[in-house]
Amino acid sequence: REISTIMGIEQYCLFRLGDAGFPAQQLQFSCNEIKFPNADNSKLLQEGEWYHVAVTFDTEKKVAVMYVDGREQSRIEDYGKGEPINLGMQNRGKDFMFKIGHSYGEPTDFSRQLDGEICEVRVWNVVRTQQEIFDNMYNVDPTTSGLCAYWKFNEGHDDIAEDYTGHGNDAHAHTSPAIWPEGIEVTQKNKE
């Protein structure tokens, strides 16, 4: 599989692993069809390991930064068009909605589905600092200013992933029944 999507909107703003001609185990951010970083085998994620991954995009300063386990991995300046990103836009059709673990096509099309597991996803409308990302890799107060959505994926029932911020951005699983993880132990790398 060439692309393994973490989250985003196809052809608009995606955080993913791999791409055509790009290493399958390297993180890539693609916004308005501008992709970063360049292919680099020194940045590959190892199969079978848990990672905390994050990307920040300051649209005003046109700077995007990618973090792995709370540490800066890649940075690009003069990135993007300087326009805000709207992950809530739904006027492009169902194939182009914000998705987690999948980016395009029908739920039964596994060609761009994440080949892995996700413990939590957070979406912010502020640029988090490296220190904030590192300190809050494993937990954050759901009422923190700028936190728009926070899915823990630990509900264990139905097909709804609750948004813990209280903003009502509940996510719906496209597999039925949803598979909820149990007993996952994730090493807290910021506490080692």
Model segments located where?
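Extracellular glycan-associated modules
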Residues: 1-169, 175-192
